[in-house]
Regions:
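N-terminal regulatory/effector-sensing and dimerization cores
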Residues: 2-107
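Residue-level signal for well-ordered alpha-helical positions
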Residues: 77, 97-101, 156, 232, ...
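Short, Lys/Arg-enriched, Trp-marked, Pro/Gly-tolerant hinge/linker segments that flank
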Residues: 105-123, 127, 131-198, 211-223
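Terminal helix-turn-helix DNA-binding modules in bacterial transcription factors
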Residues: 179-192, 200, 210-255, 264, ...
Length: 271
């Protein structure tokens, strides 16, 4: 059984990217996106990690909404395959659409909880939208379908399984570390340097950073590298250029890390 993965994006609609995967065995490391992501399970079962109370089993017809920056992963059961779809939407664009729909300020999708929905009509609407995005329909038709879907979304759809980080003071303390890691993607600063920025010991920083982000400083920076790699690949940069610019040892190293986070090779993603 061969798996198949395809991506859709259009420079005329930069606020959305979509993906379809069939009979996939690919597993993802815990990661995040800089978009609001909505995933749908089409076939097979998978395990979602990122919920406050531990892993959650997902079944066909389930939707999962994950706000930007939330660390999560969704993988098939051991030895099994699954099929799924994934939409990545710009959160600010979503809020603008909801404001148009309601005549009121839209919800802050960056602060929404992670939600799992079992609502079959919403899943069917999602599938119809994705069929349209991957079709040869005019971009105006695709944009209209997308606006209708987002406008119909209820921020209370589904069950909330994880809220946004609640410790604002902790977030403030590790923010300088996050800024440095994001600014210096081409290499990893020493842990002691990062700890000094936060006024903590190395051990304290690792614990605090994981509480604030869900990842260690090193893992978080790798996640940021992959997010930047996706942007650069969409711009048409070569794999070799991206690998070098983001501090990977070589192109092979870049491909391994990218696939572990994205569930697809850089070449598959760039097509």
């Amino acid at each position: 059984m061969r798996s198949a993965t395809e991506f859709w994006r259009d420079p005329r609609t930069p606020f959305v990217e979509s993906r379809r995967a069939c009979d996939s065995r690919a597993c993802h490391r815990p990661h995040s996106h800089d978009t609001f992501s909505i995933g749908a399970v089409d076939a097979g079962n998978s395990v979602f990690t990122g919920a406050a109370e531990g892993p959650r089993l997902l079944q066909p017809g389930n939707l999962v909404g994950v706000p930007a920056g939330r660390v999560h992963a969704c993988n098939p059961l051991p030895g099994q395959v699954w099929s799924y779809q994934m939409l990545h939407l710009d959160a600010r664009w979503m809020a603008e659409v909801r404001a148009e729909h309601d005549g009121l300020p839209g919800p802050d999708w960056l602060q929404e909880p992670i939600r799992i929905s079992h609502h079959r009509p919403r899943y069917q609407q999602y599938c119809q939208l994705n069929e349209t995005l991957f079709s040869d329909d005019p971009v105006s038709v695709k944009e209209a379908a997308l606006i209708a879907f987002v406008g119909d979304l209820d921020e209370h759809d589904g069950v909330a399984v994880a809220g946004p980080p609640e410790d604002a003071a902790l977030q403030q303390r590790v923010q300088p570390v996050m800024d440095v890691l994001r600014q210096r993607l081409e290499h990893t600063p020493a842990l002691q340097e990062l700890a000094s920025l936060a006024g903590m010991s190395r051990y304290q920083l690792i614990r605090a950073f994981r509480r604030a982000t869900g990842l260690t400083p090193h893992a978080w920076q790798i996640d940021q590298r992959i997010q930047e790699a996706r942007r650069r690949l969409c711009e048409g940069q070569s794999l070799a250029v991206v690998a070098h610019a983001l501090g990977f040892a070589d192109q092979s190293h870049f491909q391994r890390v990218f696939k572990a986070h994205a569930g697809a090779t850089p070449g598959q993603y760039r097509r």
